[in-house]
A protein has these predicted regions:
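Active-site metal-binding motif and surrounding structural segment of the metallo-beta-lactamase
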Residues: 62-81
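Active-site core of metal-dependent hydrolases
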Residues: 166-172, 186-295
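His/Asp/Glu-enriched, well-ordered alpha-helical/loop segment
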Residues: 240-244, 297-377
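Active-site mouth loops of central-metabolism enzymes
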Residues: 100-112, 163-175, 195-197
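Histidine-centered catalytic micro-motifs
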Residues: 83-94, 219-226
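Alpha-helical scaffold segments that flank or form the walls of functional sites
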Residues: 78-80, 84-86, 95-132, 137-155, ...
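Active-site microenvironment of metallo-dependent hydrolases
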Residues: 1-49, 54, 65, 122, ...
Length: 432
């Protein structure tokens, strides 16, 4: 294999208000990733510079970084992948499952939770996160301001986007909610959303959100169980063709519909270009306690078959809706594959490439010219790393921003000695 020549990858033209500042960092020092295995089985060297992939060549073919501060990272035994992204988080309520009473909504406490949860998800591999934030009522914009402070503090480590979620947008209380939503966008929310199912007039709620999105050029991300075919049809008719795009989820209610009705609803969503964020780990703070707040196996498969862009998120992260939520995109992919929604490769694509599309971020491939947003996981194949990929190296904007190392050792045993089994997991074999 010869060294690849940098090219200009196709990138979608930015439309409307940008969610994040995801431009490559021209100041990032050169970095050589040596001996990494790619998804197609090749073992390669990858040189990064200026926040992008500069070159990809056969292992040992690329020169080490020069003396200007560049470094070399040995990735022998690691699978190198485009980094995941988190399309559906609730960081403002994360890590509150063990609170003895209602979690504090003081800005400093929310900021601490958001920052800790974002770093936790970064450690799992997600270099971009979209978090839903409640605005209005008594809390005003406090939680949003905390998220925006965390975004500034985490700049250079992970990209963080806020979705503003007002409670009510119709009726007597709707005027205040609409004003708060506009203020949220002006303050820094990159996406508008909410949960129309909980409004007295769900259709009116959607109309209000779409109006604000059109006014400010924002993307839309709405919570819905998706159990009402007529309501989904109206949403598809209203939102179809909106740029920069509409995402809904988790849509678990589709599983309760007759098969033909669910297929028709999925076809309408596909025709309208609406994406769906599933939550295979279950639990979502916005819909906590509802009849279909868990995960419904088969929904993602049905949507994919209809041509809907399906991504998968973590949802609740150790809060009241899911006290054991992990926020790990590899676990989300593992569950998609385990439920039979798709194969391992497509499952990983749902939390990486499809997730980046939903977030409006540039495509990532392990090829010259693409953004250096990468995840190295110890293992040889995608199915193995989804099952046992604990050791991870995360690269954002061309530099290593997180490392997690796991070593598994076994005590002496006559059987393992007789079979010549390792006491410690092999670096190039069984993942750790």
């Amino acid at each position: 294999m010869t060294e690849s020549v940098p090219s200009q990858p196709h990138q979608p033209k930015p439309q409307g208000r940008p969610e994040t500042d995801d431009a490559p960092d021209d100041r990032a020092p050169a970095l050589l990733l040596s001996g990494a295995r790619l998804g197609d089985g090749r073992v390669v060297d990858v040189r990064l510079s200026g926040g992008r992939i500069e070159a990809v060549g056969t292992a040992g073919s690329l020169a080490a970084p020069d003396a200007t501060g560049g470094t070399r990272v040995d990735l022998a035994g690691y699978l190198l992948l485009p980094a995941p992204a988190e399309p559906h988080a609730h960081l403002d309520s994360a890590l509150t499952a063990d609170c003895p009473g209602p979690p504090s909504e003081a800005q400093q406490d929310v900021q601490r939770r958001v920052t800790e949860a974002a770093l936790l998800q970064l450690g799992h591999g997600a270099t971009a996160l979209r978090t839903h934030v409640r605005v209005g009522d008594l809390r005003g914009l406090t939680a949003l301001e905390a998220v925006l402070e965390s975004r500034r503090a985490l700049r250079g480590l992970v990209e963080l986007t806020a979705v503003a979620m007002p409670r009510v947008l119709t009726g007597m209380a709707g005027a205040e909610g609409l004003a708060v939503l506009r203020d949220a966008v002006k303050t820094g929310a990159g996406v508008v959303g909410g949960y129309p199912d909980l409004d007295p007039d769900p259709t009116g709620y959607v109309e209000a959100v779409l109006g604000v999105a059109a006014e400010f050029g924002c993307a839309v991300d709405l919570h819905t169980e998706g159990g009402d075919p007529a309501r989904l049809a109206r949403l598809a008719a209203m939102a179809g063709g909106l740029r920069p795009g509409v995402t809904i989820g988790p849509c678990t209610g589709l599983a309760a519909l007759p098969r033909e009705a669910a297929e028709r609803a999925a076809a309408r969503l596909a025709a309208a270009g609406i994406s769906v964020a599933c939550l295979p780990q279950g639990g979502c703070g916005a819909l906590a306690g509802s009849a279909s707040s868990g995960y419904a196996p088969g929904v993602a498969r049905l949507l994919r078959a209809a041509g809907v862009r399906v991504t998968a998120g973590g949802g609740a992260l150790r809060d009241a809706a899911n006290p054991v939520g992990r926020g790990d995109p590899l676990e989300a992919a593992f569950l998609l594959a385990s439920y039979g929604e798709c194969g391992a490769q497509a499952a990983y694509e749902a939390v990486s490439g499809r997730a980046r599309e939903v977030l409006g971020l540039p495509e990532v491939r392990v090829e010259a010219g693409f953004p250096a947003e990468l995840l190295a996981v110890r293992g040889q194949r995608i199915d193995a790393v989804l099952s046992l990929g604990y050791s991870r190296i995360v690269i954002h904007r061309g530099r290593v921003v997180s490392r997690t190392s796991a070593v598994r050792e076994y005590a002496d045993c006559a059987t393992t000695a007789a079979l010549d089994l390792p006491r410690q997991s092999r670096s190039g074999g069984t993942p750790a």
